[in-house]
């Protein structure tokens, strides 16, 4: 694994639509960090690695069927042009679900090379030949991998050193503790007949922490049984040590 260049996370995005970047990554926390050089983003136009007069990047699927498939030779040349040992990721709905654990691991590394699929998908041979890690951001279909790449990078960049103003904020958010977040409130004290829970204005920080944990556990148990089961299993494991 290469070390971070100048201590910066380096993202290379391979796409047919480089004009989509930085997009939302150019504003707010990610945009400020990009402008300050806390991370690096570059794009690679996949079509630049196509050959022939028409510079075709796709072809009809072997065996028939609808749509087109991105060509292995073209994609491989694009990947090889930036291969320096960083993880190679393919954004695809058939990939492993993106988790906060994987996001944090990426943030701790030197960066990532991200391939944005289009059409029906990418020739399986280049996925195998270049050992691409297939990642999904959810069980739904997008027009291409660019939006998914932006989601992944936004999640990663906010964890980089110096990006978030309050480190504790990142450590107490949903998924970092294995739970969904507790409810949040701020002034005014009462709004449309709904008051901020008294415990949050009591000044008793121990009681506040306990209330927040109980609320996070309740919300996780009700909304994400899968996360709740994993959380309980982890607690039993820790308790048994």
Curated annotation (Swiss-Prot):
S-adenosyl-L-methionine binds at residues 117, 137-142. InterPro entries: Alpha/beta_knot_MTases, tRNA_m1G_MeTrfase_C_sf, tRNA_m1G_MeTrfase_TrmD, tRNA_m1G_MTases_N, tRNA_MeTrfase_TRMD/TRM10. Keywords: Cytoplasm, Methyltransferase, S-adenosyl-L-methionine, Transferase, tRNA processing. It is found in: Cytoplasm. The keyword tRNA processing applies. It comes from the Bacteria. Its EC number is 2.1.1.228. Pfam families: tRNA_m1G_MT (PF01746). Its main location: cytoplasm. Transmembrane segments: none annotated. One of its GO terms (molecular function) is tRNA (guanine(37)-N1)-methyltransferase activity. GO terms for cellular component: cytosol. Specifically methylates guanosine-37 in various tRNAs. PANTHER family: TRNA (GUANINE-N(1)-)-METHYLTRANSFERASE. Homodimer. This is tRNA (guanine-N(1)-)-methyltransferase. It comes from Brucella ovis (strain ATCC 25840 / 63/290 / NCTC 10512).
